[in-house]
Design a protein with these regions (language model features):
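Sec-dependent bacterial lipoprotein signal peptides
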Residues: 1-2
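Short, glycine- and small/hydrophobic-rich beta-strand elements in well-ordered beta-sheets
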Residues: 5, 51-75
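Glycine-rich beta-strand-turn "strand-cap" elements at beta-sheet edges
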Residues: 5-27, 63-69, 100-121
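An amphipathic, aromatic/His-enriched active-site/gating alpha helix that lines ligand/cofactor pockets
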Residues: 8-10, 54-60, 79-113
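Post-signal-peptide N-terminal segment of Sec-exported extracytoplasmic proteins
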Residues: 22-60
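Acidic/polar helix N-cap motif
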Residues: 35-38, 70, 82
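A mature extracytoplasmic/lumenal domain signature
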Residues: 46, 66, 78-80, 90, ...
Length: 121
């Protein structure tokens, strides 16, 4: 497992964007399927994404987990203050660079799901 602990206020130099009353915090799961033998390369590339993403002011946590039974399967678990923070994340240069870096490592398309934090509804 590769993970970074969720950020606290002390870990960021910028305040998080204000959450509007009609918006909810968001959780993303992104399952990634890697070709056998490419796991170490993928983890190295993912560390860059984890580090940069956790610095985003709207990111509340960005972690990567590896399936212990199917070691070529990974899942990113991401938490954001709102949809605008996700849109910002998807528009960053390192997000696009990461997609290019791992394109030859993946065995199947990534499965991305976005959720509202239900307890806020």
């Amino acid at each position: 497992m590769v993970a970074c602990k969720p950020k606290t206020t002390e870990q960021t130099d910028k305040p998080a964007p204000a959450v509007q009353t009609t918006e909810y915090q968001k959780m993303i799961t992104a399952r990634v399927f890697i070709k056998p033998g490419k796991e170490t390369d993928f983890i190295s590339a993912a560390k860059m994404m984890i580090e940069n993403s956790n610095k985003e002011e709207g990111c509340l946590g960005y972690m990567l987990y590896q399936d212990p039974y199917e070691e070529t399967n990974f899942i990113f678990v991401e938490k954001y203050v709102n949809q605008a923070a996700i849109d910002f994340h998807f528009g960053t240069s390192y997000f696009k660079e990461f997609g290019t870096m791992i394109s030859d490592m993946t065995s199947n398309p990534m499965e991305i799901k976005i959720y509202d934090i239900a307890a806020e509804k």
